[in-house]
């Protein structure tokens, strides 16, 4: 890469990350909306009675609840989920197609694993009818197996309050799909009108169980008002965050997402907080509703526990693919991700797919590279005359600038011609950076030889060092327009970049290395072309 391009990249990186750090987008705590009806149900001609306060069941000791609860395992081709009759909640979810390490004998990724009943996820609250997370439900099955492509299967949990209110919590599973449908069906068999606002409580450890890299992202995520908000765990200590009418809310790390997705406005608010037990809690509250005697209503959600794969998330709908934050250059990063998958179908190696994409990008940008290099050559030839002008008008800056501009016009040289074409490529670089840095496709994907995880760093630092050497070669080949001091500063760049890339994903380093090698080949060809043209 030319020196000007390197300067542009560094300045862009500083601006890109510095601006985000210094001027983060304001996060307003949204007020809770007025209760609205987002439920469906029968409307019998029952008289409108006043809402009755339903007494809460007598508290049951935690040890007794744990002894009475029963676990139900659900097996699908993609995951194993274990539910508890306590709250009809989820106690464990293991992804069958993903492991914690690149080693095939490593443990499968576990998104939910709670042995403490007070920390079960997807537990349910509804104060108006006396339902709390410790309530014991009755399950419709002792176990469930869903095969790939098989018809949907249901697992229902039923609870009846002392006042005669029946709550059915129904989960629907489908083979080959990470999405789970969840519906609350409520029927009032009592004699008084009751009101309730169901709360689904998701819990997550405040510290990630597995941190795959120093660049790991982790914490609550909420999509509301067409905007993704990612909260930092440290910002939730001592205070929570509330969101009005979000489309979905949950927890995410670099590669996986756990979320509750609203259906037909079924989420009134989502409130996230850090608990004294060292857990994160996301309380999803449905719009408040009331039921007359003999009336029934339902409220629906869509659950997702799975990988942050662009295609899989998009197939789920509800803008769930926005959980993959590709930054300012998402419009470029998404096509690059699709291209990566496209070439993988044919070569079955993501490392080779990265090389193919790099070659294609080099071909696309060749006219710009040629124009940039040619302009730099012309500027290099003008250096002696420009130096004469500077000496002649060293005491008159206005006259010197005028003379230099006349020199440019006479020789038809654009002073920024060597830089602007390269600046056009900067957005593509950042888009590819985002695509490769956060692509689950590269996670544990082998390339060849010692590189067995393209999402992890090069274990022996071979590729970053070779990359640094190629940068030195590029600098030697690039026409110089700098004074000795500037040249010394530029010579330090390969060292800086080498150390910076030591802990970068090897897939990203591979791209940069191949790009450098192709640039060296390009420069050699352009040098010969220009020399041949001048010899004629």
From Swiss-Prot:
Annotated stretches, region: Disordered: 30-54
Pfam families: 60KD_IMP, YidC_periplas
The keyword Membrane is assigned to this record: yes
Membrane spanning residue stretches: 5-25, 350-370, 420-440, 454-474, 494-514
Keywords: Cell inner membrane, Cell membrane, Chaperone, Membrane, Protein transport, Transmembrane, Transmembrane helix, Transport
Membrane topology designation: Multi-pass membrane protein
GO molecular function, one term: membrane insertase activity
InterPro entries listed in its UniProt record: Membr_insert_YidC (IPR019998), Membr_insert_YidC_N (IPR028053), YidC/ALB3/OXA1/COX18 (IPR001708), YidC/Oxa/ALB_C (IPR028055), YidC_ALB_C (IPR047196), YidC_periplasmic_sf (IPR038221)
Entry function: Required for the insertion and/or proper folding and/or complex formation of integral membrane proteins into the membrane. Involved in integration of membrane proteins that insert both dependently and independently of the Sec translocase complex, as well as at least some lipoproteins. Aids folding of multispanning membrane proteins.
Quaternary structure note: Interacts with the Sec translocase complex via SecD. Specifically interacts with transmembrane segments of nascent integral membrane proteins during membrane integration.
Name assigned to this protein: Membrane protein insertase YidC
Originating organism: Geobacter metallireducens (strain ATCC 53774 / DSM 7210 / GS-15)
Phylogenetic placement of the source organism: Bacteria, Pseudomonadati, Thermodesulfobacteriota, Desulfuromonadia, Geobacterales
């Amino acid at each position: 890469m030319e020196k000007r391009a390197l300067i542009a990249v560094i300045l862009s990186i500083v601006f890109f990350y510095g601006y985000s750090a210094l001027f983060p987008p304001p996060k307003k705590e949204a007020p809770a909306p007025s209760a609205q009806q987002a439920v469906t149900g029968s409307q019998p001609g029952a008289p409108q009675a006043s809402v009755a306060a339903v007494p809460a069941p007598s508290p049951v000791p935690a040890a007794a609840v744990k002894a009475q609860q029963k676990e139900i395992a659900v097996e699908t081709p993609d995951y194993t989920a274990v539910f508890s009759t306590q709250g009809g909640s989820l106690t464990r979810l293991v992804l069958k197609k993903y492991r914690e390490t690149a080693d095939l004998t490593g443990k499968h990724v576990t998104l939910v694993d709670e042995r403490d009943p007070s920390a079960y996820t997807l537990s349910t609250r509804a104060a108006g009818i006396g339902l709390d997370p410790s309530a014991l439900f009755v399950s419709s099955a002792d176990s469930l197996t869903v095969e790939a492509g098989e018809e949907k299967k249901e697992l229902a949990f039923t609870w009846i309050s002392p006042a005669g209110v029946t709550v059915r919590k129904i989960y629907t599973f489908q083979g080959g799909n990470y999405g789970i449908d969840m519906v609350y069906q409520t029927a009032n068999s009592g004699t008084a009108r009751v009101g309730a606002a169901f709360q689904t409580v998701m819990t997550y450890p405040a510290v990630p169980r597995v941190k795959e890299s120093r660049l790991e992202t982790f914490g609550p995520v909420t999509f509301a008002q067409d905007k993704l908000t990612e909260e930092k765990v440290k910002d939730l200590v001592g205070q929570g965050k509330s969101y009005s009418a979000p489309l979905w809310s949950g927890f995410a790390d670099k590669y996986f997402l756990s979320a509750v997705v609203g259906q037909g406005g079924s989420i009134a608010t989502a409130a996230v907080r850090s608990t004294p037990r060292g857990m994160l809690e996301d309380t999803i509250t449905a719009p408040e509703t009331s039921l007359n005697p003999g009336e029934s209503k339902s409220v629906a959600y869509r659950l997702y526990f799975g990988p942050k794969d662009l295609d899989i998330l998009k197939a789920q709908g509800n803008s769930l693919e926005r959980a993959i934050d590709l930054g300012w250059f998402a419009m470029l990063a998404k096509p690059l991700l699709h291209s990566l998958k496209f070439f993988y179908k044919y070569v079955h190696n993501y490392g080779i797919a990265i090389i193919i994409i790099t070659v294609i990008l080099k071909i696309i940008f060749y006219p710009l590279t040629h124009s940039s290099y040619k302009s730099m050559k012309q500027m290099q030839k003008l250096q002696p005359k420009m130096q004469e002008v500077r000496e002649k008008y060293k005491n008159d800056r206005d006259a010197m600038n005028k003379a230099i501009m006349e020199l440019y016009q006479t020789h038809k040289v654009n002073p920024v011609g060597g830089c602007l074409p390269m600046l056009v490529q900067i957005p593509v670089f950042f888009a590819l950076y985002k695509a490769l840095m956060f692509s689950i496709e590269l996670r544990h994907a082998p390339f060849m030889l010692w590189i067995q995880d393209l999402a992890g760093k090069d274990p022996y630092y071979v590729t970053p060092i070779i990359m640094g050497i190629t940068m030195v070669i590029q600098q030697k080949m690039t026409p110089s327009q700098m004074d000795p001091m500037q040249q010394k500063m530029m010579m330090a760049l390969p060292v800086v970049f080498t150390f910076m890339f030591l802990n970068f994903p090897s897939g990203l380093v591979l791209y940069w290395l191949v790009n450098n090698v192709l640039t060296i080949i390009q420069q050699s060809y352009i040098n010969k072309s220009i020399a041949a043209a001048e010899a004629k």
